[in-house]
Amino acid sequence: MAAPVARGECSEAALAAALADVPELARLLELDPYLKPFALDFQRRYKKFNETLNNIGENEGGIDKFSRGYESFGVHRCADGGLYCKEWAPGAEGVFLTGDFNDWNPFSYPYKKLDYGKWELYIPPKQNKSQLVPHGSKLKVVIRSKSGEILYRISPWAKYVTREGENVNYDWTHWDPEHPYKFKHSRPKKPRGVRIYESHVGISSYEGKIASYKHFTYNVLPRIKDLGYNCIQMMAIMEHAYYASFGYQITSFFAASSRYGTPEELKELVDTAHSMGITVLLDVVHSHASKNSEDGLNMFDGTDSCYFHSGPRGNHDLWDSRLFIYSSWEVLRFLLSNIRWWLEEYGFDGFRFDGVTSMLYHHHGMGQAFSGDYHEYFGLQVDEDALIYLMLANHLVHTLYPNSITIAEDVSGMPALCSPISQGGVGFDYRLAMAIPDKWIQLLKEFKDEDWNMGNIVYTLTNRRYLEKCIAYAESHDQALVGDKTLAFWLMDAEMYTNMSVLTPFTPVIDRGIQLHKMIRLITHALGGEGYLNFMGNEFGHPEWLDFPRKGNNESYHYARRQFHLTDDDLLRYKFLNNFDRDMNKLEERCGWLSAPQAFVSEKHEGNKIIAFERAGLVFIFNFHPSKSYTDYRVGTTLPGKFRIVLDTDAAEYGGHQRLDHSTEFFSQPFKHNERPCSLLVYIPNRVGLILQNVDMPN
């Protein structure tokens, strides 16, 4: 009799079966041998994914048809001018359509009950063939629950919802314009290295109000293009009743937020970005939903289990929101159709999936430290229904548009999250490197500059699995929110309000802040990943935190804005940080370090506070020492020949001290140093980041 296999082990026969079932599992295990004991988990996940895909094929005609739910569910104009309506409300006793078209008579247009909890209604056109429910009409679905309660609801498939005056709840507005927006530009090519500008339309104006899609299109997109970003991540687009939720309490999943304008204006924004060569990603929230019932998904059919788990499992205690039941056939249809809707109707080029950690585990990541022990990523704590949904979503996105981009926000470090589905992975293109901003905040908050640990910085910036692509960032919207601080605020604090004028001498605080702000962002950009992200305004050290209007601040918009005009004022030092960000991005576009293999770090010297590495044929040198500069400092390189400075944080246009002569040529010699065959001598002043390029390199 064979010996029993302990948890965390895998018999040879079981491993062989897993390798036979998962086409490229061998490649995954070759890249990460520590995953070998969990081969059966990958086998089970992959088989379950294929079973679900095959079931969709047998029962729905394939995922292509299945993901077009928005073409039949909701309300649609027919060729004859009539209206076809369809809903899924398994807990309802009766379903009706009402609105201003029938003077809000709740029961005059009943739906017909179909199988599997579906209901449909056909409303013929008027005798003159005109529409009974014209564009802009207000509508409601009326639900008669099994207990006899009459509920007024917005269709989960509503394409546009609006709130007028002092109304607390949103209204469903029928969106069927006579002249819908026609896209003029094709999608841009997939960037070889993504440089993402994390954006929020509503806060994009310096005025104390909610900005519009049009404002963003005509005033912010040109700035993004000028700064050298090739991708924008649009936050808070899916409709959310509570503005201060930052777009993370979704009420209408198919509706573009009306507080910024119309659906056609959002399409113009995306199309204009495409004309500039900018890829557009949507921040998609499928990890949870708002608890709102009158203008949300919650209790749509009068039960708590329509789209969500019933009972405690259906509630996220920390977020005070509802949790989807990913094993439900109709929930899968709803979510996959939602993904496709944003790709096809609005022209988005991919997604950043929010709250993936919460989806992956039954514990939702709450109270979990995630030590990196691989047993934390497998077993009963994993919500495999949610995992299969994410695999299906990635499969759909990359099948429809192979050049699309998907990014996972996962703090746990789930292995194979960004591996191909054929390897047993989940299929994301990138994951967010969420430990990096925490490290910078920790250093600024807890350590003196002279106590910064160079090895620890390098470890944090390079701690990623081989061939698992990461989006690096020094800070995102999370650090900008009230209760936290941006890097600029940690560095310069209150002096940002008094000492940013070029007419006044540098104070020690402002000098330190401006120099370290550039260095932190450059080393994160160059060493931290295969993509880079910045939250709007942080590139120039935006002087205030972010706080949306709410009761606690008397509904003030003062901190819910971005003061881009500060960079346009020649008398303020914000322009220096803005200039640096632009040139850093444009140099990456030219040299392509984000798409190059991971850097070779040749030096992390604790006493000298020096970090040196090579990537994409460039030599990066950072001197984090607060006071020591070094002449003739030897730095290793693989390349012989002549080098020149191509980026210098100490340059005058970046608010530096101009201590380096850019006409200087550096010659490497065949003198081995720090495991490099060649080396060169450089002058590296304190608090300076430097990039050298071999003059014989093609770029």
Curated annotation (Swiss-Prot):
UniProt superkingdom: Eukaryota
Annotated site location: Transition state stabilizer: 478
GO MF term (any one): cation binding
Coiled coil: none
Family recorded in the similarity comment: Belongs to the glycosyl hydrolase 13 family. GlgB subfamily.
Subunit note: Monomer.
Protein name: 1,4-alpha-glucan-branching enzyme
